[in-house]
Structures are given as structure tokens and as C-alpha cells.
Amino acid sequence: MTSLVEQIVRCPTKSAWGCSPKFVNLRDLYVGKKEAPIGDLEKERRLNLNTQVSLDNITITAYIQSKWLQSLKDLVENNIAITMKLATTDRFEAYTQDVGRVVLLMQYDKIKGQAFNARPFRLEFNPNKLRPVDKSILGTIIAYLEDISISRADLAFDLFELDCSNFILEKKGKGVATKEFRSKDDKLETKYLGASRSEKQIRLYNKKLEQLSSGTESEKQFASQFKNWWRLEFQLRNRAVDEIFTVINEIIFKPNNFENLTLESQIYLSAMLHDKSTWRRVHRNTRSKYKKMLDTYQTSEIDYLAEMKNLLKERREKLETELAFYAGKFVGQ
């Protein structure tokens, strides 16, 4: 079976690097947002949602083509934007940085690669953080690589002016490890579905709060313009990367509002969401009944998850092209 990026065979844009996607910064997406030709009602809802989707953290591993190994070393050693942390004959580590933060991390370890039968070169970056100089370096490096594998890709939905502190985030089907962090007044700040080292982990967190507490000055300024800014993020590793456009179908995401249900139903749903130890003692048929109710019961006029799926469908071709570029599918075209 071919992987996701191997199914993409055409590229709409050309550059000096060969074939590349159009890089778009998250801030540009928000400020210069253009609506697709959709119906008035759906368009109004989309405008109210102010939602954007983008690729976030990316990790690729690869082999360096032998004929380009010296060229890559020269690039890393001589480019003024690159800081060399470590350099030996068979190993180096280097990075670009902006405001004291690593933007593009480059690691090469030939001996370790041979010892573990693994690709020896590794690149880590966040597409939303790349500056023009980083994009230029990235494009040059990708052209030097072969047998590229995307070992991590994050898909991020930014939800502007939507308070998700009382939203439900659950996985359909079999449960997974869950962790929550709440404020002093018991409002949700962060929720994790799945273990941090698993192939899939889903995060919902208060992005505005995170940016204001640990962002750069420009990031804090950007975040300050919003009353609410939340992010729903899907972190995928290894084989799960191929599920990047379908993993959203595995979750339940909606406001926590069951006031119109019977008291009995509300109690069962509350136990499922907030008292896992008690919930495990409930008969499996009852658990199945209320898990289905949680999934299908409409808790608000807007189906937020459906709107996010529609947005992903609209942006899928662009995101596929971007992923394929990182995987080196367009080099030399």
C-alpha cells in the first residue's frame, strides 16, 4: 500500500528549488483570510468560527545522497543563518534560530544510523515559524536527500474567538489515556487524548494563554487581540502520519450542554466524562448506549466538528502538496 505522500503526483507551483508548495504563515491566514464560494448560511457560520487549519511540527528523517554530502556540510558550515553546535567527520548538529528559539534543527549521525539501521539525517521544524531564510535552507537541503520519511506531522486547528473551556473532547470507540489540566476555577486549560509517546496524541489547549505566558513579544501581541484562541492539535508519528486527513473522524468535539436530556442521562454522561473509575463499572451495553448518545446528541446549533471537517476538505489539496514537498516528492521536477 502506498503512503499518503506517495499518492500525490502533481505540483501546482514551481520555484528555484524545483516544485514547492506555497508557504503560508498562520498570521497571514488570519489577517488575509479569503472565503471560498459557499452558501450564505454556511459562509456566515464559517465567518463566525474564524477557524484555520495548518501543518504544525514536522520531523523528517532521510539519507543524504553521497554526491551531495559535502555540499550539505558546506551549507551547514558556511551559511551565516546557521549555528553549528557540533561537527565531526560523521556527525553534526546545527540549527537556525529566531529571537533565541530554534527554528530549523538539523542532525546527522552516520554511526548511530548504521548501528540502528536507521536514516542518519533528521530535520525538525514548524512550518508556521519558518522565515524566508529558513525556507530557502530547507528547500536546498531537501534536494540533497533521498528515502525521506515523515516521522512526525501535527495538524492544528486554530479556533479564534471560541471559548472551548467547556467543550467535550473524547475519542470514539475504545478509550485511551486521558489527562486534563484545569484552572483554579475549574475551567479546562489543556486536555490530552493518548500518551505522549504513542503514534497518535490529540491535544486541546488554550493557545492564547500559552502564547501570553511563553511566547515572544510579537506572539504575545498577536494573541492579545483575541478574547479567545484555542487550538485542537493532532500529533501523528510514524505510520499514523498517513492518517492525517482522517484522524479527525475518530473524535467527539462539541460544547458540553445536555440540559435537555433526562437527569438519568445527564448523570451517566457526567460519569463517562468526569469519573472514569465509576464509568468502568457500568455494564458495557449501557456504556455503549451513552457513548453513542455523546457522539450523536446535538449540543449546539453549530456542529463545530463538521465545520472543521469541511475546512480540512477545502484545504486538503494545499496541505497534501506541502507534505509531499517535505517528503521530497517534487525534487527535480
PLM regions with names:
Residues T2-V282, Y297-Q333:
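Structured, helix-rich domain cores that form ligand/interaction pockets
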Residues R287-K292:
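Helix-turn-helix DNA-binding segment
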